[in-house]
Amino acid sequence: MSQTALILLQRVEHLGQMGDLVHVKPGYARNFLLPQAKAMRATAANKKRFETERAQLEAQNLKKREEAERLAERMHELSVVIIRQAGDSGSLYGSVSTRDIAAAATEAGLTISRQQVVLAHPIKQLGLTEARIVLHPEVSIPLTVNVARSAEEAERQARGEAIGVQDEDENILGELQAENAAEEAAAEAAEASEEA
């Protein structure tokens, strides 16, 4: 399989640091790294150009990183609430996407794009979930996503209280146990009346 040689212009997660010579699949280079100016082809002319511009690129990167760190300090322990419909078991009708999280974060005062939101797994249940907001390739902040059916439920979840799904299950279990006890009492009464 052919590989394309590139020089990274910034840190790329799981690939390398600025200035690294990397070999990637042509599609990854053509569709992601080159259009987003994260890398340039590793030709002799580009290598010379990169070495002459390296100090300028590093200074730009340092400035952007410092801005991202200042923003990260201001947005420490950020949390967003997303209201969704869900079934009795707590399963969402659909899922919460990175686009939904980016929109909620923008409403909370942090303007980000959906590409900056990183989820470990899709959100398909009610509850609190951790996401990560990548402000810079070297700076990210945690984000708590509170998915609930209503604002009141979101407040209860934020305080650490159990939501209604478990309460309903306990009520149903209690009702079933009461019905079973009543049936057993009726059966015992019927047996006692037959014996007499």
From Swiss-Prot:
In terms of InterPro entries, this protein maps to: Ribosomal_bL9 (IPR000244), Ribosomal_bL9/RNase_H1_N (IPR009027), Ribosomal_bL9_bac/chp (IPR020594), Ribosomal_bL9_C (IPR020069), Ribosomal_bL9_C_sf (IPR036791), Ribosomal_bL9_N (IPR020070), Ribosomal_bL9_N_sf (IPR036935)
A Gene Ontology CC term for this entry?
A: ribosome
Q: Which GO terms describe its molecular function?
A: rRNA binding; structural constituent of ribosome
Q: Which domain of life is it from?
A: Bacteria
Fetch the Gene3D superfamilies from UniProt.
Ribosomal protein L9, C-terminal domain, Ribosomal protein L9, N-terminal domain
Matches recorded under PROSITE patterns? RIBOSOMAL_L9
Pfam families tied to this protein: Ribosomal_L9_C, Ribosomal_L9_N
| Keywords attached to this entry | Ribonucleoprotein, Ribosomal protein, RNA-binding, rRNA-binding
Transmembrane ranges?
none
Q: Does NAD count among this protein's keywords? A: no
Q: What biological process terms from GO does the record include?
A: translation
What PANTHER family does the record point to?
50S RIBOSOMAL PROTEIN L9
Main function: Binds to the 23S rRNA.
Q: Which family does it belong to?
A: Belongs to the bacterial ribosomal protein bL9 family.
Question: Which HAMAP family is this protein grouped with?
Answer: Ribosomal_bL9
Task: Indicate what this protein is called per its UniProt record.
Answer: Large ribosomal subunit protein bL9
Q: Which organism is it from?
A: Gluconobacter oxydans (strain 621H)
